Amino acid sequence: MENLRRAVHPNKDNSRRVEHILKLWVIEAKDLPAKKKYLCELCLDDVLYARTTGKLKTDNVFWGEHFEFHNLPPLRTVTVHLYRETDKKKKKERNSYLGLVSLPAASVAGRQFVEKWYPVVTPNPKGGKGPGPMIRIKARYQTITILPMEMYKEFAEHITNHYLGLCAALEPILSAKTKEEMASALVHILQSTGKVKDFLTDLMMSEVDRCGDNEHLIFRENTLATKAIEEYLKLVGQKYLQDALGEFIKALYESDENCEVDPSKCSAADLPEHQGNLKMCCELAFCKIINSYCVFPRELKEVFASWRQECSSRGRPDISERLISASLFLRFLCPAIMSPSLFNLLQEYPDDRTARTLTLIAKVTQNLANFAKFGSKEEYMSFMNQFLEHEWTNMQRFLLEISNPETLSNTAGFEGYIDLGRELSSLHSLLWEAVSQLDQSIVSKLGPLPRILRDVHTALSTPGSGQLPGTNDLASTPGSGSSSVSAGLQKMVIENDLSGLIDFTRLPSPTPENKDLFFVTRSSGVQPSPARSSSYSEANEPDLQMANGSKSLSMVDLQDARTLDGEAGSPVGPEALPADGQVPATQLVAGWPARAAPVSLAGLATVRRAVPTPTTPGTSEGAPGRPQLLAPLSFQNPVYQMAAGLPLSPRGLGDSGSEGHSSLSSHSNSEELAAAAKLGSFSTAAEELARRPGELARRQMSLTEKGGQPTVPRQNSAGPQRRIDQPPPPPPPPPPAPRGRTPPTMLSTLQYPRPSSGTLASASPDWAGPGTRLRQQSSSSKGDSPELKPRALHKQGPSPVSPNALDRTAAWLLTMNAQLLEDEGLGPDPPHRDRLRSKEELSQAEKDLAVLQDKLRISTKKLEEYETLFKCQEETTQKLVLEYQARLEEGEERLRRQQEDKDVQMKGIISRLMSVEEELKKDHAEMQAAVDSKQKIIDAQEKRIASLDAANARLMSALTQLKERYSMRARNGVSPTNPTKLQITENGEFRNSSNC
């Protein structure tokens, strides 16, 4: 998304801009009918931006959802529309719209959040029936003015180097909310500048020193250190959080498991089941966490490893484990488990049961991270103590793994985007307000910070002051006769193919690999004030050995173009030239050595700013006490120290050169220098010619019409633009080298400097074929100081590159003008003319032969150079292929290891589930055995009861028989002499023992 924005606004970082940010919470609604689901839609200036989830009405409708929008257009109103979710089964229920809440953007503008109950404006208000529905909304709308990055350079450098003293001075006076905002800005800025690891380590060690022996207080107070690590965890750990807990949290949202284990909130019969559910959920959560080490962010590993190393060096290695566990679990993982919507794991706020389950899981996880058991305060959780003790060793192993510096290469780095300008602007506004509240004694300890803040505040208060000169229209040069020519050149350059350029405006967010992209300061040896340039060396590009041994190309110069042009003492352009439009060549010696001919206005206008030559001999040596100038983009740029003709700097590009003429080149070959030296005999002719500008101009125009350079064909700019993080295309093989031209292969492998304004205009060279000539732009230094002249001449000595078209034209024009003066009687005396011509013809023939021999040697040398260059390109291409092959293999290996880690994780989960299943089976078997044994006892008792019942029945029948027999004898009057004796046998039967 950021790349799309930069495509629309490529000059964003180098121009003054305004950012609009809205943060809004839709919290809850009241006075709505019950047993319905309600949702809200968020519209900004009548454009739908977001929608809440549907929530069921209980006491109130609670959403608790937050939304954050950046890069907004200027807002007038924020509207929240309230809807009732329609039941799809009831077709008659069509009208689900209930009303709206309209907030003027100005009412919530500022740094503080505004939280209020807002009445819902309904389409059909019902008067006299009590208050209508209301929605509680918390919102903040900010308009942030952001200056160009150049304006924040000193501020950012000061923050990067003096953050510790700043935090110590501001800590006592800041509120908790301000600390949070300041810590967020500092973390984002230092992440961009590559100093965040040192920043967090220094803050943590100061926090350890402050707490002393009270280790339990670390990360439990609202300090800048706590807020900083919180923000850093959110910044680099968002993807890790999603990978580690995203699926688990989503599964909990969808499940209906009840994990309430508080006896006061659930029945005793359900308690064992709920305890089992909670234990299972905690096991799964911790299993997810300890197996997430393979996707743990590399930056966090580096920070934790730095903490462990620093604690060991201070003689307190035991506290490093507490630091790591407290920061990761207390400030990141456990809050994310409790409130997934705040950490963007899910949008919806959980219902009551899910929220309670998440809270209990977070309690167990936090106790596990603290290596503590549940006590009397939460006695109902004591059943989890066995689980905690069992997992302590795994927790220690996990903490050791995520702080092990030896496994840093196995994990990915931060891939997000940071708007550095916005963060610097936010930090400036916070510091501007905070520093004004400090005592003067404390302010004096902050060094240059108050002055830097005042400078930035002045730039913010002055509209238009933040616009860099390089961001203006490159073709807008008033009062210059070459304005149309410059405009044509700019148009031609914009339409050229830009696929070979490094696009500075589309660089990815800084990482440890490319963190030097931002604020890499290099001071120039010839500038009175430090001139810094942002540089970047791409690892994927072929290494080109520059003339000065450097392999890094400076892409943007942060110096003011108009300042450089104005420091020479006199402006360079048509308004600074004499009235006849000519400057004697003797006055141009600083810019073009070994030239002794007048230069017309038409030729000089093409290099008006590219070669700002002094117009008087006095100024050519540099005024005393006046700073000497540098070449465009400063002379540190190795692209200006190469032997071949190189493109003009972006600063001089917009108003130099034309479509029909080549720009001047300071690289002259040996024969041109020799020819120019031999023309000294025509000095009187040159002086006479200087007094006749009209005829010379006419002849030069006729010469241009006869042998002028054809216009270079324009190329469509719709070709693909390669980003810096993409591999470069393989270099094409060099075509046959035409006579007197620089082949494109000498320039095709160069990385041309990107314009500091971020526009698409570039100085990419074109090779249009036999009918065109290569544009060679000037690379001479602007107003070189006398000390730099010998070195510059040494670097720009004889070169195998042939002179460009304008150099050859100037030499030939000088010869033609001398011949013209001879014909008109201005040369030597006529009697000596014939003798002179014969000698000149002979010397000319010898000279032509020598020139041809030199050209042959030069051509042979060029051919050898091209062969060498082609071999170097082949080797470079082969190296790139091997490098990408190695990267591919490394990526495959990393994916394989990650897959293995995932497999191990799944196997661990499966083994845990199998062990749980085995335990359940074992418990079931034991219970079944107990039931079987009890059943056997019951069966035996039932048999015994049945036998007793049978014996009892027989006894009763025997008694009945005896009673009947006794009664019969009594009725017959017979008294028994010998009463019958009954005896019970062993089998329970009665036996009569009488003799009868």
From Swiss-Prot:
PTM summary: In response to TNF-alpha-induction, phosphorylated at Ser-535; phosphorylation leads to a conformational change, and thus, increases its association with 14-3-3 proteins, MAP3K5, RIPK1 and TRAF2 in endothelial cells; also stimulates regulatory p85 subunit sequestring and PI3K-p85 complex activity inhibition.
Comp. bias regions, Low complexity: 476-486, 659-672
Effect of R220L: Loss of GAP activity
Record's GO cellular component terms: AIP1-IRE1 complex; axon; cerebellar mossy fiber; climbing fiber; cytoplasm; dendrite; endocytic vesicle; neuronal cell body
Positions bearing Phosphoserine: S535, S554, S785, S802
Region ranges (Necessary for interaction with AKT1): 453-750
Subcellular location(s) of the protein: Cytoplasm; Cell membrane; Membrane; Cell projection, Dendrite
UniProt tissue specificity: Expressed in brain, lung, thymus, bladder and skeletal muscle. Up-regulatedd during prostate degeneration.
Compositionally biased intervals (Polar residues): 460-475, 522-538, 746-762, 774-783, 974-996
Record field: compositional bias (Basic and acidic residues): 830-841
Function per UniProt: Functions as a scaffold protein implicated in the regulation of a large spectrum of both general and specialized signaling pathways. Involved in several processes such as innate immune response, inflammation and cell growth inhibition, apoptosis, cell survival, angiogenesis, cell migration and maturation. Also plays a role in cell cycle checkpoint control; reduces G1 phase cyclin levels resulting in G0/G1 cell cycle arrest. Mediates signal transduction by receptor-mediated inflammatory signals, such as the tumor necrosis factor (TNF), interferon (IFN) or lipopolysaccharide (LPS).
UniProt subunit comment: On plasma membrane, exists in an inactive form complexed with TNFR1; in response to TNF-alpha, dissociates from TNFR1 complex, translocates to cytoplasm and forms part of an intracellular signaling complex comprising TRADD, RIPK1, TRAF2 and MAP3K5. Interacts (via NPXY motif) with DAB2 (via PID domain). Interacts (via PH domain) with ERN1. Part of a cytoplasmic complex made of HIPK1, DAB2IP and MAP3K5 in response to TNF-alpha; this complex formation promotes MAP3K5-JNK activation and subsequent apoptosis.
Protein's name in the database: Disabled homolog 2-interacting protein
Taxonomic source organism: Rattus norvegicus (Rat)
Name of the encoding gene: Dab2ip
